[in-house]
Amino acid sequence: MSYQKVYNDWKQDPLGFWKNQAKEITWYKAPDKILDDSKKPFYNWFTGGAINACYNCVDRHIENGKGEDIAIIYDSAMCKKVRKISYLELKQNVAKLAGALKGKGIKKGDRVIIYMPMIPEAVVAMLACARLGAIHSVVFGGFASSELAVRIDDCNAKAIIAGSCGLEPGRIVPYKPLLDEAISLAEHKPDFCIVYQRDELRADLIEGRDFDWNDLVSEADEADCVPVSGEDPLYILYTSGTTGQPKGVIRPVGGHLVSLNWTMKNFYDVHPGEVFWAASDVGWVVGHSYIVYAPLVSGTTSVLFEGKPVGTPDAGTFWRVISDHNVVSLFTAPTAFRAIKRADPKGNFLKKYSLTSLRTLFLAGERADPDTINWAKDLLQIPVIDHWWQTESGHVMIGNPWGIEKLEIKVGSPSVPIPGFEIDVLDENGNILPPNQLGSIAIKLPLAPGALPSLWKADDRFVSAYLSKFPGYYETGDAGLKDEDG
């Protein structure tokens, strides 16, 4: 089937298109409505019904006989260790932590901040919240106390789950002093904190407020999945606001799972049992979507990498990870490849490894300059696919839909709109510009399932930040142009 056919099918019957995609994930009860547009300009997909993200990402694969399949490959260049976690083991760890949280009073709708490094326990913490219907808000590990405090106050976090430290090349970053300072700065005080003690640095715990992860989990019962409505928030992810107050992007559970599941097969062309590696951090949107929820909901294996593209120990680290784990597709930011290119311009480190498993390299997160794209393409001898999206969208908006049709790659362009997004380039007055004229990239409402329905406790700010400039459109804040091919 061609891209144009799929895109036209969506455009002619968007509700039918997404209703079909919703059947690919498991609902305890089907949604009451595919799209609720009764409160325009606020739109909600898959309202009512009953669903659980953790069930879809973990339990259902076990029930389908895939429990021994590997869910996560943890590869730490910092600790020089590799750990493979099956779906079965992941479920046990998640259900135990969820039981510990439940035992301490965490329930559906409560907010839990996660402040952790790139270790499997970060994923376990996210899924444990999802299992209970609690709303997680992951804050990048090591982020400043003042920023963490603002987030504690904004979401009224009932609990915080933290790691004792993060690891950077040549140094250990203690997280606990940053966490203690943030709680002292915050007006709202969480009920309790759970601290995962890493061997590299153990944190001092405050009696009565802080609890050791292993102690709590060892005494906990396994908790079952709690059904939530399709439009309920799975998480809040804060983006840095230009005005100082960060914006809490809400991610609705039903739409997010449906669209992520669709992208793994149709966009990234990665399938159950294959190994996908998003070289990002769970603190960013790429980590939420493509280290955790998309690979797991689709039953693929996700690489969780703790390290850097260079210096841990050298510019061959990415090639080692791909070779060791048979990665079929790598998704990273152009910055990572620029760093590798600077350190090893001739690609000598590549000669030490076999990358026969690698089919595609996907780039996003910033502009991919032609130099970097061409260098990577010449070195790896595989397609290098730029794509464009935002924290707000949760998944790709413009890209080359590799799993549907492999379109010609135009270096410097992320390619075509993805089903779910009707995208125009507008002038200052909101008129659609002809081809090859630079203007504001704007997206017709409603946005695709999984994109933000609003900002946390800030509907007015959502409207003023995104919807006020071009009525009927979402303003992306980015500039661009469309060529004659769209």
Model segments located where?
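N-lobe entry segment of adenylate-forming
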Residues: M1-I85, E89-Q92, K96-G99, I183-K189, ...
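Conserved AMP-binding/adenylate-forming core of the ANL superfamily
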Residues: C54, I72-L127, A144, L148-A149, ...
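Conserved pre-ATP/AMP-binding loop-to-beta segment of ANL
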Residues: E68-I70, C193-Y196, I206-Y238, Q245, ...
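Structural core segment of the AMP-binding/adenylate-forming
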Residues: L127, R131-D215, N326, A333-P334
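Conserved AMP-binding/adenylation subdomain of ANL enzymes
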Residues: L257-V275, V285-S329, R342-F349
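Gly/Ser/Thr-rich phosphate-binding loop
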Residues: T300, V328-T332, K341-E408, E422
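Conserved beta-loop-beta connector loops within the AMP-binding
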Residues: D424-L445, K482-D485
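Conserved ATP-binding/catalytic segment of the ANL
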Residues: A442-G486
